[in-house]
Amino acid sequence: MKAKVIDAVSFSYILRTVGDFLSEANFIVTKEGIRVSGIDPSRVVFLDIFLPSSYFEGFEVSQEKEIIGFKLEDVNDILKRVLKDDTLILSSNESKLTLTFDGEFTRSFELPLIQVESTQPPSVNLEFPFKAQLLTITFADIIDELSDLGEVLNIHSKENKLYFEVIGDLSTAKVELSTDNGTLLEASGADVSSSYGMEYVANTTKMRRASDSMELYFGSQIPLKLRFKLPQEGYGDFYIAPRAD
């Protein structure tokens, strides 16, 4: 496999986000593109990242399916070295993954491949009563502001408006999002409510560096789905299970 990433900074933030949930992962490489998926150790979050071949400026595969196992910590330690104008070339053989930054000067790093057990993805064929579309930066800024106020994020919808609420020990914070005030691009669905672990939701906000817009789906006592849209119809999906209490 050989793939050239023009926006290496954005790519690095995608993998940093994955690294907040998983310690090890596989690049599943086919002629269609690269997929990374997995379930976090607490089994609260299932993530599914897909970067189509058109996401890359150059994309070469030598076999029908290639599985590239790696430790997120090792890859992210390298990706933290990326500079603003760098391009990134990913290449692999049977034993190693090579990351090459090409910018003002060229730097190459090699990592040994590891065996990562493939996880069976859960069934995510869900009917979501409510859907909203918004800018990723809007979502990330709101969650960042609320994240230190409490451990539980309450989400509810009413009359096509979306509400984020956190009840802390000393105060309660509530944010209204709607198409009227410009915080939602689109919204439709039923009046529903559910609660999710704030830490899991907050760990997705690094995607703002890679994604301009996103979709949010939820319903009463079903997983929250966050779809971060990526260039060339790529996406980053995060399914977060509701809190039981």
Swiss-Prot record:
The gene is pcn2. Keywords: DNA replication, DNA-binding. Belongs to the PCNA family. Forms homodimers with PCNA1, which then recruit PCNA3; does not form homotrimers. The heterodimers interact with RfcS homotetramers. Heterotrimer which circularizes head-to-tail (head is at N-terminus, tail is at C-terminus) to form a toroid; DNA passes through its center. Replication factor C (RFC) is required to load the toroid on the DNA. This subunit interacts with DNA polymerase I (dpo1). The heterotrimer also interacts with flap endonuclease 1, DNA ligase and XPF via the other subunits. GO terms for molecular function: DNA binding; DNA polymerase processivity factor activity. Pfam families: PCNA_C, PCNA_N. This is DNA polymerase sliding clamp 2. InterPro entries: DNA_clamp_sf, Pr_cel_nuc_antig, Pr_cel_nuc_antig_C, Pr_cel_nuc_antig_CS, Pr_cel_nuc_antig_N. One of the sliding clamp subunits that acts as a moving platform for DNA processing. Responsible for tethering the catalytic subunit of DNA polymerase to DNA during high-speed replication. Heterotrimer stimulates the Holliday junction resolvase Hjc. DNA polymerase I, DNA ligase and the flap endonuclease may be constitutively associated with the PCNA heterotrimer forming a scanning complex able to couple DNA synthesis and Okazaki fragment maturation. The keyword DNA-binding applies.
